[in-house]
Amino acid sequence: MKKSIWIAWKDVKIRITDRKGFMMLILMPLILTCILGAALGSVVDGGSRIDDIKVGYIQSDQSDTANMFTKDVLKKMKSIKVTKVGSKDKMKKLIDEKKIDVGIVIPNHWEAGKTSAVVNAAPDQTLKSSIIETAASSFIEQYKAVKEAASGSMDYISKTEAVKQGKLDPAQFAEKLAKTLEKETGDKLTIAEKSVGSKAVTSFQYYSAAMLCMFMLFHITVGAKSFLQEKDTETLARMLMTPAQKSVILFGKWLGTYLFAIIQFFIFLIVTINVFGVDWGGNLLLVSVLGLSYAAAVSGISMLLASCISDMKTADAIGGFGIQLLAVLGGSMLPLYQFPDVLQSVSKAVPNRWALDGFLSLMEGGGWADLQKPVLLFAAIGFCSLVIGIRRLHTR
């Protein structure tokens, strides 16, 4: 074990004194966090609060249902300001002039469900247009359900003895039922602005976690390249000639990568807390557990990669294109919620996505329950990659 620690410490000292490596893994993520957190604040922070939605409204359908949607849904929502518009051309002009955020047209026969509401908005108002579109579609779906429920109830009531004996007036009952259900339909639709967790994540928080997850990935190639460099300079061959077992030497190489990843993690954590004022959540112990397990995973993958490649060009290619691809898929470049469904599914196959989700959960007020899956996953990845990598390198 002492020999493994000695080998690990040797690698750590080499990487600390490497100015290029220090800039890449320590300073660069901090610089990018500062730039992205400030420049793209509207992309992330914009999702944590919805400003008042200015809606232009054209109502071609003059049915009671369409009137109820305007009166009991749109006009009762505090965050929506409704303006009646005379024509579609006027609506388009108001959208272009930024006087309204969203335009909605209720066409003829909307009540019957034969046509859908048409929602128009500027390209930068997709969230607000989605809210209005969802409100309209939810309302009409609830109205249909109410109508079917009322129809079914009346069919049942009309067959009862009370109606047959004249003790119950079906028309009066139907009127009361309709009013009650209509009121419920309008009252059910509200907009609640709420974070997924107990706290909302700011842009600096998001990109602090995102940059940390991305730059810790570089240890995959840094560890593999360190192994290849020592192989090319025959340093590894000289170490293998010593009485130390091969597995001890190889474990020491993994430990060196792991220790440097830990150093990077804690430096980044301390600087973002004290300089940028980033809140990583109420429990830094859980943040550390997640960071340490993620570091173990990327260090294990570095040994597996070292066992699969034999030249520096391949390592450089993976370090360039491969790591950037993982960073994009894992949400380090753009927030995950902006991904289409297909990429959302694909991103779950990369480790940095799990790490980012874990850090964000802690920032939102989550606890150990949110970390169990990623921590166990990273432990499994790190252990399996280390064992397979050492066995492959041992035979080589």
UniProtKB/Swiss-Prot annotation:
Cysteine pairs bridged by disulfides in the record: none
A single Gene Ontology CC term: plasma membrane
InterPro entries assigned to the protein according to its UniProt record, in alphabetical order: ABC-2_transporter_component, ABC2_TM, ABC2_TM_bact-type
Lineage top rank: taxon: Bacteria
Domain ABC transmembrane type-2: start-end pairs: 161-396
Gene Ontology molecular function, alphabetical: ABC-type transporter activity
Keyword NADP: no
Membrane topology value: Multi-pass membrane protein
Transmembrane segments: 21-41, 204-224, 258-278, 284-304, 317-337, 370-390
Localisation: Cell membrane
UniProt keyword Secreted present: no
Keywords per UniProt: Cell membrane, Membrane, Transmembrane, Transmembrane helix, Transport
Induction behaviour: Induced in response to linearmycins and other polyenes via the two-component regulatory system LnrJ/LnrK.
Gene3D superfamilies registered for this protein in UniProt: abc type-2 transporter like domain
Described function: Required for resistance to linearmycins, a family of antibiotic-specialized metabolites produced by some streptomycetes. Part of the ABC transporter complex LnrLMN that probably facilitates linearmycin removal from the membrane. Responsible for the translocation of the substrate across the membrane. Also mediates KinC-dependent biofilm morphology.
Subunit structure: The complex is composed of two ATP-binding proteins (LnrL) and two transmembrane proteins (LnrM and LnrN).
Family that this chain belongs to: Belongs to the ABC-2 integral membrane protein family.
Protein name: Linearmycin resistance permease protein LnrM
